[in-house]
């Protein structure tokens, strides 16, 4: 447990330093110093104060600045804010993840975006289906070459 440092500022106020946090205890309640609370990636990017009711904070943590930068670059902060307000709270995380995926895909492929990735995957599925059909046909031909012969449980042929 980190060492706790306490010092009195005024008779009505006491400051406690515990780990990275600085807590001021007033007679009216407890207030945390804002310098230790990092703003969310969106507020940091937009250079504004991150409030407790920030719509971006739960979905754009300070550790992921490129996630918001990409989303902002493609969709714009105002549009993302509107989307988050229109979406039900339990669906917002999925909406943000979808926006982040689409933004990253659009930055990689400005013309097709995620549709280009979907197209590549569809072609890959078709190629693998054809390969599977060809392999099954080869297997049937091989089984047909054996004719009436069957194999025993021990791998030997019985005629």
From Swiss-Prot:
Disulfide bonds: none annotated. InterPro entries: LOB (IPR004883). Expressed in young shoots, roots, stems, leaves and flowers. It holds the Pfam family LOB. Transmembrane segments: none annotated. The gene is LBD25. Belongs to the LOB domain-containing protein family. Residues 38-139 form the LOB domain. It comes from the Eukaryota. This is LOB domain-containing protein 25.
